[in-house]
Amino acid sequence: MKKHLLTSFSKSLFALLLIGSNVSAQQKDTTSRPIHLNQIGFYPAAVKKAIVVSDKGGDFFIQTTQKKTVYTGKLNTSLRPNFAGHIVQYADFSAFGKPGKYVLYVPSVGYSYPFEVKASVHKAVADAAIKAYYFMRSGTALPEKYAGKWHRVEGHPDTVVLIHPSAESEGRKAGSIIASPRGWYDAGDYNKYIVNSGITTSTLLSLYEDFPAYMKTVKLKIPESNNKVPDVLDEVLWNLRWMLTMQDPADGGVYHKLTNAAFDKFEMPDKDKSPRYMVQKGTAATLDFAAVMAQASRIFKQYPKELPGLADSCITAAKKAWGWAVKNPEVAYRQEEINKKFEPKITTGAYGDNNFTDEFIWAASELVATTRDVAYLKNINLLPDNRMPVPTWSQVRLLGYYTLIKSDITENVVQDLPEIKKRLISTADDMISGVDSN
């Protein structure tokens, strides 16, 4: 099954790379915009295809950068035009696998952007994708030694965060101050959101959990690179330690976000001096938190000397969050309603959700996988409908399925497991079919 999922991911990545391939083609040379391919390159034994948006040409040629032809093939016309309505042909040169730097040439059309064929061809891209999280760190300077031309000074230390009236509790009155440092900034603003962090942090934890041997070799050139913890986990820790500060220690509930009242201006982090607020607890945030902490606990348990007590802290926090969610199963974050009742009004990203079935499935699955206590699945309907939705911040059900399947939990314990496996494989097959038929 894992092979199905990895194949699906690889083909989806290929499709995404094709979509963006003409961005770099805007060079004053002989490259042709109608020829779209993976500009980074291909593994020697992998599928290799290029899309030619033209009805011209019959043959295509793989040439060295010195224009020496090393492979020849026939263009195949697509069974249907692309979304723009143009005639689309594709060049399949999967049979060619000699390492080197090449271009694809189609007479009457032109040359492709240069690409490579080599082992580990996507390593630099993969490393850069993970290193991107370092640049999103809040509450720390990014020295030039690690950040290069994107170096900057510290912004948003978040040592003085106000409890918003929507988040008031008996032990934390509105206006009281707490500290909530670290974490990652969100997509285009300087706020920090638990719901977004949930799926993001879990994705990186799963990357390590699924490929531990490889991830231990990945060096990201971050300040923690010389310690004995894999760099990807060091980066996770920057956000995970912030997430732990988002839980109310009194009752286990988790605040939805740490935010300014409104979005920032387009300015560097250190220039923003706006008050920061901890906003309402919610069921979605609390369950996402529980899931991540349970997953983190079983992973960081492998590093007791380097991170003493962290695994225990994570599972304790996860259990406490679960307890709050069970008592408060339908607390939705509705920003418009909050703004009718409280000041200041909060107008940053809402990331609201009104259905928590998927969050309960995910959190319960992670807790079962970590604690081996199947009681967490009691009263949880693992298959509430026939859908197998692709994970996103607002739909995390499949993350729970994937965890259950990867664990050594048997169908004797979880009776729905065979059906979950069947549906997951079918979904992966559909994804592959969609790529192949487009």
Q: What kind of region is each of these model predictions?
A:
Residues M1-K28:
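Bacterial Sec-dependent N-terminal signal peptides
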Residues G20, F83-Y90:
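Charged interaction patches that mediate protein-protein contacts
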Residues D29-P34, D59-H86, G97-Y113, H122-N438:
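Glycan-recognition and catalytic cores of secretory/periplasmic carbohydrate-active enzymes
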Residues T31-K56:
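Contiguous beta-strand segments within globular domains
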Residues K49-I51, Y90, V103:
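Beta-strand secondary-structure signal
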Residues A91-G97:
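Short, hydrophobic beta-strand segments
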Residues V117-A119:
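Interdomain boundary/hinge segments at the C-termini of tandem beta-sandwich modules
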